[in-house]
Amino acid sequence: MSGFLPFSRPAMGVEELAAVKEVLESGWITTGPKNQALEQAFCQLTGNQHAIAVSSATAGMHITLMALEIGKGDEVITPSLTWVSTLNMISLLGATPVMVDVDRDTLMVTPEVIEAAITPRTKAIIPVHYAGAPADIDAIRAIGERYGIAVIEDAAHAVGTYYKGRHIGAKGTAIFSFHAIKNITCAEGGLIVTDNENLARQLRMLKFHGLGVDAYDRHTWGRAPQAEVLTPGYKYNLTDINAAIALTQLVKLEHLNTRRREIAQQYQQALAALPFQPLSLPAWPHVHAWHLFIIRVDEQRCGISRDALMEALKEIGIGTGLHFRAAHTQKYYRERFPTLSLPNTEWNSERICSLPLFPDMTTADADRVITALQQLAGQ
């Protein structure tokens, strides 16, 4: 048997090592010029006026919700089929997450479902660009504008995703992730883009103790060392060590995503003859970033359950992932919302499985996964 093939592996090389070495030798290793360069590069990528680097996408979600003054008595619409950090941040601020169902085959929330969930207490809508494909964001933003509700795009899967010719986040507010399995990574990190100048100013304060400037800003421009606290804030800044890695990865983005796309196409061609169901692609014009390649394993159709398939693949050295278990089935949220029923979400949550997909995979690696799936399907 070949060595273990993980579900994901970061694509790191000599360029990232050199970038880290440069920062370590510079004398300034925390938030500084590499953060500024990363923010500028993201504005060029998405076309937004402002970018705010943070220590994680979760941190970005937290301070974005705070900056929008979301709290007790407010409701925030979000799919249940998402990572629980979004639900956690909403709940920790005292607001109520209103979990809605997704399309059965794209796993993304639809404008119709969002609009049906709006009440006088709705303060924000958080659509997820799932697995690297874009949600129908124009239609969702139109709903937000019509009702006066903020739209926060969960773009954790969407670095390199385009919707109708525009990069995700363009002309809106979106939060990206640089976690270890994402399309670009710096181990841990995130970034918010927005065209709202007041929101950007609030985010910069909230990410760094509520100060109007950070330490590098004071050091560079010779401002008074005793900075003023303008509002209570957090310690969510990104170090320049991390920013340097993310910046180097961003330069490679087109190459990294091209390789992901090639592997995804290899899977798609093979799955056409197998009972495992991949996700459907959105109907609107888009460029898929292929953050994840997800199949649905229905036991009646496939002759094997999802959990049994994942275990069988593990036994022959192939890793898989689960993105995601529905949040409303987690203990805390199950007890808080005991009567909530989301049929499409629940059907998929019990069947989805993420196959290995990362830029350093070889064609032989993908063939190995395909052969294993063929054998497990009895072919």
UniProtKB/Swiss-Prot annotation:
It catalyses: UDP-4-amino-4-deoxy-beta-L-arabinose + 2-oxoglutarate = UDP-beta-L-threo-pentopyranos-4-ulose + L-glutamate. Keywords: Aminotransferase, Antibiotic resistance, Lipid A biosynthesis, Lipid biosynthesis, Lipid metabolism, Lipopolysaccharide biosynthesis, Pyridoxal phosphate, Transferase. Pathway: Nucleotide-sugar biosynthesis; UDP-4-deoxy-4-formamido-beta-L-arabinose biosynthesis; UDP-4-deoxy-4-formamido-beta-L-arabinose from UDP-alpha-D-glucuronate: step 2/3; Bacterial outer membrane biogenesis; lipopolysaccharide biosynthesis. One of its GO terms (molecular function) is UDP-4-amino-4-deoxy-L-arabinose aminotransferase. Its cofactor is pyridoxal 5'-phosphate. Its EC number is 2.6.1.87. GO terms for biological process: lipid A biosynthetic process; lipopolysaccharide biosynthetic process; response to antibiotic. Catalyzes the conversion of UDP-4-keto-arabinose (UDP-Ara4O) to UDP-4-amino-4-deoxy-L-arabinose (UDP-L-Ara4N). The modified arabinose is attached to lipid A and is required for resistance to polymyxin and cationic antimicrobial peptides. Belongs to the DegT/DnrJ/EryC1 family. ArnB subfamily. Homodimer. This is UDP-4-amino-4-deoxy-L-arabinose--oxoglutarate aminotransferase. It comes from Escherichia coli O127:H6 (strain E2348/69 / EPEC). The lineage of its organism: Bacteria, Pseudomonadati, Pseudomonadota, Gammaproteobacteria, Enterobacterales.
